[in-house]
């Protein structure tokens, strides 16, 4: 396992939250990524906004520097309006009396107006000021009138002036409009950013403030802490990124995805490398925990030791011939290659992979390193082929960095060869020239074909690997071997697909050639 140096980093980024881009302060530590809401950035106010606590502008939907500018969804449509201009099918009109404070005014912000095809809406109530103390106003209230002045058809500026001239005592007619609340409510990292999948029993985090699922650690800040252990950091995976500014962080249980946007390509690359580095630095800890968990139940011949585990992307075929990359967790043990759709924290989960392939019947057939990494527009991929009873199963995987590609290439090649040395031999029954025989391939001794004679076996043929001149199969049930002997080509009916034994044969040969130093 390589030694990784953990990175620390901090700065402003944008987070996709409730289909809106909001600015957050990101802080990366060795074990977690903390996101803190930037209140001023989430709902920016124009510079001249201090008339009785009201913004003096067009509602803030497209202010310079706003995260929503040109990026978020369009302004919400106006609620259905009746003949009098009021929203239909909504709660009754309420009359609220508010006494302004000497400093701070009403203490509300408004959005909407006739030019925006919206009623005048209360979009923010400042804590501790007059509106908040009245306990009678709420976000999403439409202001219908101020001291008798009708605001149903008022522009935003007209509403601002009416509230400004209202005097110390203000009588408001308001009506709550539920449909617009999601558009004006400030997104909350604590309540609106779902994130689960941390280890349910993780010794390494048991005494850390970053343990478990993300949480609200400071009552005065909108903050969430994302444990990085077994997360998947990716680029250009689940969301198009034409500007190369996005970073995806997938939870260990694959249920949630966090999308971050940086100011430019270079910043995004820097953040991605730092996050990815810290995730990879936690892998030795994960391997130790997994092997400790599995060691309690593994048998002497179980070979359950996990050699490597990490997230990558697998190419999946969709309807219509389309293809899509999707996250997949790959684990390599002493004998098997395992694929999961989420992190198996428990023994039961570990015992139920989506796919399991014997390494001795698997080989790496492609490992391509493009001139650039996925974060810069080119894919780094490798492919595996496994001989199974159904034929050849092929998987194409994508990694995020050149180092990942190198690691997986080495792990798979060395893992297949080590599995060959560990397993030593494979034996199966078949039919040769009309008689039932047993065909055995031994890593050291080569090929043996025996026949059972009433409890005792007799050797029909025995050849070392170097005598093999040709091997072939029909992909259905027959295996053809030619050792250059007087018997000529041997045709063995395996009664099932010959691909598993063919792949085992090739793995044995590759491992022996590598051991002899003839193949690096």
From Swiss-Prot:
Record keyword Acyltransferase present: no
Mode of membrane association: Peripheral membrane protein
Modifications made to the protein after synthesis: Phosphorylated. Partially dephosphorylated upon insulin stimulation.
Region (Disordered): 45-95, 195-220
Tissues/organs with expression: Ubiquitous. Expressed at high levels in the testis.
Gene Ontology CC annotations of this record: anchoring junction; microtubule; protein-containing complex; synapse; transport vesicle membrane
SUPFAM superfamilies from the UniProt entry: PDZ domain-like (SSF50156), PH domain-like (SSF50729)
Pro residues: compositionally biased ranges: 73-82
Phosphoserine modified-residue sites: 75, 90, 109, 191, 202, 213, 373, 375
PH domain boundaries: 143-280, 305-417
Keyword vocabulary terms for this entry: Actin-binding, Calcium, Calmodulin-binding, Cell junction, Cytoplasm, Cytoplasmic vesicle, Cytoskeleton, Membrane, Microtubule, Phosphoprotein, Repeat
TM region(s), chain numbering: none
Lineage top rank: taxon: Eukaryota
Family note: Belongs to the syntrophin family.
Free-text comment about domains: The PH 1 domain mediates the oligomerization in a calcium dependent manner. The PDZ domain binds to the last three or four amino acids of ion channels and receptor proteins. The association with dystrophin or related proteins probably leaves the PDZ domain available to recruit proteins to the membrane.
Function text: Adapter protein that binds to and probably organizes the subcellular localization of a variety of membrane proteins. May link various receptors to the actin cytoskeleton and the dystrophin glycoprotein complex. May play a role in the regulation of secretory granules via its interaction with PTPRN.
Subunit structure: Monomer and homodimer. Interacts with the dystrophin protein DMD and related protein DTNA; and with the other members of the syntrophin family: SNTA1 and SNTB1. Interacts with the neuroregulin receptor ERBB4. Interacts with PTPRN when phosphorylated, protecting PTPRN from protein cleavage by CAPN1. Dephosphorylation upon insulin stimulation disrupts the interaction with PTPRN and results in the cleavage of PTPRN. Interacts with the sodium channel proteins SCN4A and SCN5A. Interacts with SAST, MAST205, microtubules and microtubule-associated proteins.
Name of the molecule in the record: Beta-2-syntrophin
Source organism (scientific name): Mus musculus
Highest classification ranks of the organism: Eukaryota, Metazoa, Chordata, Craniata, Vertebrata
């Amino acid at each position: 396992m390589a030694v990784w140096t953990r990175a620390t980093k901090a700065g402003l980024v944008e987070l996709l939250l409730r289909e809106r881009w909001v600015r957050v302060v990101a802080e990366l530590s060795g074990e977690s990524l903390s996101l803190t809401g930037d209140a001023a950035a989430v709902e920016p106010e124009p510079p001249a906004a201090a008339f009785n606590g009201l913004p003096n502008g067009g509602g803030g939907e497209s202010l310079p520097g706003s995260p929503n500018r040109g990026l978020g969804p369009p302004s919400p449509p106006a609620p259905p309006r009746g003949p009098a201009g009021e929203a239909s099918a909504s709660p009754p009109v309420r009359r609220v009396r508010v006494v302004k404070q000497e400093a701070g005014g009403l203490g509300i912000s408004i959005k909407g107006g006739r030019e925006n095809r919206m009623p005048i809406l209360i979009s923010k109530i400042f804590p501790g000021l007059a509106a908040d103390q009245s306990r009678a106003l709420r976000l999403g209230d439409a202001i219908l009138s101020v001291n008798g002045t009708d605001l149903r058809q008022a522009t935003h500026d007209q509403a601002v002036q009416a509230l400004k001239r209202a005097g110390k005592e203000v009588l408001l007619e308001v009506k709550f409009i539920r449909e617009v609340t999601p558009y004006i409510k400030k997104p909350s990292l604590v309540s609106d950013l779902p994130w689960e999948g941390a280890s349910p029993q993780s010794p390494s985090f048991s005494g850390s403030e970053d343990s478990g699922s993300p949480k609200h650690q400071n009552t005065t800040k909108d903050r969430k802490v994302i444990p990085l252990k077994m997360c998947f950091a990716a680029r250009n995976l689940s969301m198009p990124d034409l500007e190369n500014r996005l970073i995806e962080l997938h939870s260990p249980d694959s249920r949630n995805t966090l999308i971050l946007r940086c100011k430019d390509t270079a910043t995004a690359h820097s953040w991605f490398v730092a996050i990815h580095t810290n995730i990879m630095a936690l892998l030795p800890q994960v391997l130790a925990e997994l092997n400790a968990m599995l060691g309690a139940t593994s048998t002497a011949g179980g070979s359950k030791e996990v050699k490597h585990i990490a997230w990558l992307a697998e190419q999946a075929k969709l309807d219509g011939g389309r293809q899509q990359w999707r996250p997949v967790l790959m684990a390599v043990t002493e004998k098997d290659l395992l694929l999961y759709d989420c992190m198996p924290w428990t023994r039961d989960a570990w015992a139920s992979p989506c796919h399991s392939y014997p390494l001795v019947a698997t080989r790496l057939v492609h490992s391509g390193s493009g001139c650039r990494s996925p974060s810069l527009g080119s894919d780094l991929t490798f492919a595996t082929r496994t001989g199974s009873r159904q034929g050849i199963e092929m998987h194409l995987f994508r990694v995020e960095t050149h180092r990942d590609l190198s690691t997986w290439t080495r792990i798979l090649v060395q893992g297949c060869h080590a599995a060959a040395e560990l397993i030593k031999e494979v034996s199966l029954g078949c039919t040769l020239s009309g008689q039932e025989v047993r065909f055995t391939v031994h890593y050291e001794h080569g090929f043996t074909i025996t026949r059972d004679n009433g409890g005792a076996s007799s050797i029909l043929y025995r050849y070392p690997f170097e005598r093999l001149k040709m091997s072939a199969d029909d992909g259905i049930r027959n295996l053809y071997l030619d050792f250059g002997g007087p018997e000529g080509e041997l045709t063995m009916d395996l009664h099932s697909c010959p691909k598993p034994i063919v792949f085992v044969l090739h793995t044995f040969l590759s491992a022996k050639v590598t051991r002899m130093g003839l193949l690096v």
